[in-house]
Structure formats: C-alpha cells, structure tokens
C-alpha cells in the first residue's frame, strides 16, 4: 500500500482557517469509516478527528510513537489526521513536540475504530 502524507505542521500559522467552514464527514465506527477518511484525505488538506483517549496516549514517545490502548478512559480529544499507510493513520497532536515523534504518532486502524468519536474536514481555506 502506498503511504499518503499531507502537510500538517505543529508550528504552522493557522490564520488560513479564519473563514474555513467545518463539514462533518462521519461519526460511526465501521471499516467504511477508515476508507472514507482516506478518500477525504486525498481531497482535503485538513482533517480532524475526535477520540475517546486513554492512558496509553501518555506512553507515546520519540522511541515508541505508535499509539496503544492502555488503562482508563480520559475523555475526548481532537487531533489532525495527516496521512496513512498500512500500519494506520499518521496524526499530529497539538500537545507539542514532546508527544510521540515531534508531535506525530501512528494510530493503528483497530485503535482508530475503538476510540473514534467523530471526524470533520474543513473547506473554504484561504492560504
């Protein structure tokens, strides 16, 4: 499978989002959700998804940047989806560069379906 990576930078100026319109694209937990997210990632620059995260998110580091489920639920949190490959989605977390690999992590598809709450894409972006 080919990897697809979009531009997502933790240090990017987000003024281009000022007039953006949010479009919800899914809120179910099926394998079709994964395929829909991949299709939309090809068409749009900016995807966000909300997850019911757990303690395993705090284990994500430079050495271990693949998310794993662990412990109790900590509530909802949104991240940017930047790409995917055969291992899962590449995400950018806004917790800073101390999270995962300089702010990035891989979210395996099974964990995506387990913790997924909603997804959205933005239109009318002015760069």
Predicted segments with their positions:
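Predominantly the structural core of cysteine protease catalytic domains
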Residues: 1-92, 97-127
């Amino acid at each position: 499978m080919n990897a697809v990576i979009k531009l997502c930078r933790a240090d990017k100026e987000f003024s281009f989002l000022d007039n953006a319109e949010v479009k919800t694209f899914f809120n179910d937990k099926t394998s079709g959700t994964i395929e829909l997210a991949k299709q939309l990632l090809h068409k749009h620059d900016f995807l966000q998804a909300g997850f019911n995260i757990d303690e395993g998110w705090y284990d994500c580091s430079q050495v271990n940047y693949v998310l794993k489920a662990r412990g109790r639920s900590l509530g909802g949190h949104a991240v940017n989806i930047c790409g995917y490959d055969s291992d899962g989605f590449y995400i950018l977390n806004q917790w800073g560069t101390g999270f995962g690999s300089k702010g990035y992590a891989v979210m395996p598809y099974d964990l995506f379906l387990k913790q997924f709450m909603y997804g959205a894409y933005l239109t009318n972006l002015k760069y």
